[in-house]
Swiss-Prot record:
SUPFAM superfamilies: Periplasmic binding protein-like II, Porphobilinogen deaminase (hydroxymethylbilane synthase), C-terminal domain. Its EC number is 2.5.1.61. InterPro entries: HemC, Porphobilin_deaminase_cofac_BS, Porphobilin_deaminase_N, Porphobilinogen_deaminase_C, Porphobilinogen_deaminase_C_sf. It catalyses: 4 porphobilinogen + H2O = hydroxymethylbilane + 4 NH4(+). One of its GO terms (biological process) is protoporphyrinogen IX biosynthetic process. Belongs to the HMBS family. The modification S-(dipyrrolylmethanemethyl)cysteine is found at C242. It comes from Pseudomonas aeruginosa (strain UCBPP-PA14). Keywords: Porphyrin biosynthesis, Transferase. This is Porphobilinogen deaminase. GO terms for cellular component: cytoplasm. Monomer. GO terms for molecular function: hydroxymethylbilane synthase activity.
Length: 313
């Protein structure tokens, strides 16, 4: 990296490119004269579209190739959806910036029905997420949940082709890509607790690049970072990746954080819930504490069964 050039490693999906372009624009706005270029690449998770994420196994399905580009010096920063970022980083890399969060909720999308409540019994609902599946079936065990992978455009096309009565997507992705009008209703966090980091964009770079860290500082949103720190600490304590039925969501209440966590049986027959509050400075400890509460309720057995089916630890 020259002092006036930054190369961004990004996935090639429309949403990933939107996020990278957003970071590019913010950097150029903050630092006139800075040159920012995109380096699009395909991740393992993008290539394996014919199986549910939980069955592919492994963590970092959507980030490993980007991290390799950082380690080899081909790129200077990598832009990620925070819900895809593993808890641990390769030696020499770290997460230095978390941008302001978009709407963290799940969105109900259908061409026929206005809300989840309106779906008739037996309706087919598409999702790639065991977290969404567990919470959907807990509320509506009469629904059929069918596997749905692919980028946002692909998923919408499958809905439009009549393969599903409704699909559930992250509201943030639809909003960012200009598909907000496709959202029939946003599902409250009480009814569908989001994935840790959902709606937030993170920037990863080499730990030794202190000059670069300073350039990224204007993009950092401290409130979002505190909330995501608590959520990620919960995920880490539960050894969770982006393809397990773990949900968590933190909000700031004055000088405190309120964190809610959930672990669910994929068939919706059991949802374990926990919550806690702590001062802002104790975000990480709060995440661990709420995770411990879930473990005491039996979360480990649920997660081990999911990992066992996926064929990985």
């Amino acid at each position: 990296m020259s002092s006036r050039e930054i190369r961004i490693a990004t996935r090639q999906s429309a949403l990933a490119l939107w996020q990278a372009e957003y970071v590019k624009a913010r950097l150029e706005q903050a630092h006139p004269g800075l040159t920012v270029t995109l380096l699009p690449m395909t991740s393992r998770g993008d290539k394996l579209l014919d199986a549910p994420l939980a069955k592919i196994g492994g963590k970092g399905l959507f980030v490993k190739e980007l991290e390799t580009a950082l380690l080899e010096g081909a790129a200077d920063i990598a832009v990620h959806s925070m819900k895809d970022v593993p808890m641990d980083f390769p030696e020499g890399l770290g997460l230095y910036t978390i941008c302001e969060r978009e709407d963290p909720r799940d969105a109900f999308v259908s061409n026929t029905y206005a809300s989840l409540e309106q779906l008739p019994a037996g309706s087919v609902v598409g999702t790639s997420s065991l977290r969404r599946q567990a919470q959907l079936l807990a509320r509506r065990p009469d629904l059929q949940i069918r596997f749905l992978r692919g980028n946002v455009n692909t998923r919408l096309a499958k809905l439009d082709a009549g393969e599903y009565d409704a699909i559930i997507l992250a509201a943030a992705g639809l909003i960012r890509l200009g598909f907000e009008s496709r959202i029939r209703s946003s599902i409250s966090v009480d009814d569908s607790l989001p994935a840790g980091g959902q709606g937030a964009v993170g920037i990863e770079c080499r730990t030794a690049d202190s000059d670069l860290h300073a350039l990224l500082e204007p993009l950092h949103h401290s409130d979002t970072a505190l909330r995501v720190t608590a959520e990620r600490a919960l995920n880490k304590r539960l050894n969770g990746g982006c393809q397990v039925p773990i949900a968590c969501y933190a909000i700031r209440e004055g000088d405190q954080l309120w964190l809610r966590g959930l672990v669910g049986q994929p068939d919706g027959t059991q949802l374990l819930r926990a919550e806690g509050r702590a001062p802002l400075a104790e975000a990480e400890a709060l995440g661990v504490r709420v995770a411990e509460d879930l473990l005491e309720q039996g979360a480990e057995a649920i997660l081990e069964a999911v990992y066992g089916e996926a064929g990985h630890p």
